[in-house]
Amino acid sequence: MAPDGSIARPTVLTGPSGVGKGTLVARLRERHPEIWLSVSATTRAPRSGEIDGIHYFFHSKERFNKLVQSGGLLEWAEFAGNCYGTPREPVSERVANGIPVLLEIELEGARQVRKSLPEAIQIFLAPPSVEELEKRIRGRGTEAEEAIQRRLKRAQEELEAQTEFDAVIVNDDLETALAELEKQMNLTIS
């Protein structure tokens, strides 16, 4: 059950690269360790230190394709020759047991989840402005100009889709965004 005794609803969180999804989710999980963050399945090889079932569910292409064909994934996509997706079963099990579930996924994945899990709360995390988003991306200092421009172009496309979501949270201040996310997820501070 959710904190108020209602049935737990899964929550989908998406937003452009650099908006602060990872930071917000980490802070949310500090305050609410009961939240289960979905674990993606992938066909890519594990990197050093990655543990199957913790960081990803590592599958062969054949096993992944069987999951796709059987409806075993809530959403999936292919990036750089590898497939990634959200397994349905672990999400369904936790929701059935009243555990709050959070899916931090890309826009296209969120659209697929809307069809496969219509009861999910869909939240879009937006930057205060495109200029601030660019500042954050450049502030990382990890990408070439061409990659930054690609991210900004994609971010503009994603920002145009925010009206598709149940709620939009502007990540101008981490604590304010956190309080709004907690409210949307019907979480209480213990």
From Swiss-Prot:
**Family matches, as InterPro entries:** GK/Ca_channel_bsu (IPR008145), Guanylate_kin-like_dom (IPR008144), Guanylate_kinase (IPR017665), Guanylate_kinase_CS (IPR020590), P-loop_NTPase (IPR027417)
Q: Name the Gene3D superfamilies for this protein.
A: Guanylate Kinase phosphate binding domain (3.30.63.10), P-loop containing nucleotide triphosphate hydrolases (3.40.50.300)
Decide whether keyword Ligase is in the record.
no
Pathways per UniProt: Purine metabolism
Keyword field contains Nucleotide-binding: yes
Q: Which GO terms describe its cellular component?
A: cytosol
Note the coiled coil stretches, chain numbering: none
- EC identifiers of the protein: 2.7.4.8
GO molecular function per UniProt: ATP binding; guanylate kinase activity
Identify the keywords attached in UniProt to this record, alphabetized.
Answer: ATP-binding, Cytoplasm, Kinase, Nucleotide-binding, Transferase
Record: residues binding ATP? G15, P16, S17, G18, V19, G20, K21, G22
User: Where does the UniProt annotation locate this protein?
Assistant: Cytoplasm
Catalytic class of the enzyme: transferase
Catalytic activity, reaction form: GMP + ATP = GDP + ADP; dZMP + ATP = dZDP + ADP
Q: Which CDD domains does the UniProt record give?
A: GMPK
Q: Give one Pfam family, short name only.
A: Guanylate_kin
Q: Which part of the chain is the Guanylate kinase-like domain? A: 8-186
Q: Which family is this protein grouped under?
A: Belongs to the guanylate kinase family.
Q: What does it do?
A: Essential for recycling GMP and indirectly, cGMP. (Microbial infection) Catalyzes the phosphorylation of dZMP to dZDP, when the bacterium is infected by a phage that produces the substrate for the synthesis of dZTP (2- amino-2'-deoxyadenosine 5'-triphosphate), which is then used by the phage as a DNA polymerase substrate.
Q: What is the name listed in the Swiss-Prot or TrEMBL entry for this protein? A: Guanylate kinase
